[in-house]
A protein has these predicted regions:
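Surface-exposed loop/turn elements that mediate protein-protein interactions on large endomembrane-trafficking
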Residues: 1, 17-37, 62-89, 109-123
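Repeated scaffold domains used in trafficking and secretory/extracellular systems
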Residues: 1-12, 36-52, 78-103
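Beta-strand-connecting loop/turn residues
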Residues: 19-20, 52, 59, 103-104
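Short hydrophobic interaction/assembly module
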Residues: 43-69
Length: 123
């Protein structure tokens, strides 16, 4: 498996490549989609224990739903494939880590040690 792995699960892994985070299928080592872009690089990532979503953090956070049709992340685009927050317009938060605390909740830790809980709505 390549270097710069941010997270992995049974069937997927997320690899950091400069400011992008890309999802790969372990079967065939195949690129699936870009799941995030973070100014200053992605700091951390989790893949949901049920492989329903992944979350990348750094400059803000991006929750990307792991369901077809997979499409490459594009900043500011409104889509059902992902949602993002704390990424600009005067509300930028720098996150250092993310962890899953329940099947539908994640906990983000910012650069000052502050915690934020986010509920992931799955459609």
């Amino acid at each position: 498996m390549p270097q710069n792995i941010l997270a992995q699960s049974e069937n997927y892994y997320v690899k950091a490549d400069y400011e992008t985070a890309e999802l790969y299928a372990k079967d065939g080592d195949r690129r699936v989609a870009c799941v995030g872009e973070h100014y200053g690089d992605a700091a951390d990532c989790i893949i949901d224990s049920g492989e329903r979503f992944c979350v990348t953090v750094g400059c803000g956070y991006i929750v990307y739903l792991l369901k077809p049709p997979f499409e490459d992340y594009a900043s500011g685009k409104v889509t059902a494939q992902w949602f993002e927050s704390d990424r600009g317009n005067g509300s930028t938060v720098w996150y250092d880590s993310v962890r899953q605390i329940s099947p539908s909740q994640i906990e983000l830790t910012d650069e000052n040690g502050g915690k934020k809980t986010v509920t992931v709505g799955l459609k």
